[in-house]
Amino acid sequence: GVLQRVGVCFAAVGVLAIWSRAATQWTCLLLLLFGYAALLAAGGTLEPWHNLPSRVDTMLFGDMAYRYDTATGLGHDPEGLLSTLGALASTLIGLRAGALLRDGHPARLLPAAIVLLVLGALWSTWQPLNMNLWTPSYVLWTAGWALAALWLAHMLIDRMQWPPLGRRFGVNAITAYAGSGVTVLALLGTGGWGWLYGNVFD
């Protein structure tokens, strides 16, 4: 699940942030990107339900997988075990981006964003941008946009003193995510979901 993946990434990268140097973190990032890419390539196909991450989820979790097809005996989890390697790589890039800000080098964020976007686009010619598999190309592409957004937010809020309107959501991201799920369940249970789609979103 999403929260389980967030917890794993937070814990693993948190340990690296406290107990390792930058060189070790970069080495781990490269090993994750190229190691996961090699595993995906060795898996033979990236087709839904038949790719290596889905096969691993089926082998480990069986019919307890998030999605399980009883007809084929195949399982799939968009936040599965093997694809967490890609999510760990994304988290490590975030760690290094934060280090640029802490060390007083915010100007490097935008060039880094451009490099990541270019690398992600090039990598996607081999392995496509895919969120469910969290492919290495998806890691680089989304990290590029995230760094560009971080640079822009830093310039507008920290440098130009714009009001930090989204700060409450940023510092309470887990609460906001869980709250959105609770809200959906409440709307479904009270019939409000159908009313919204019939009267507001339609």
Where are these regions (language model features)?
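Alpha-helical transmembrane segments and their immediate juxtamembrane cytosolic regions
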Residues: 1-202
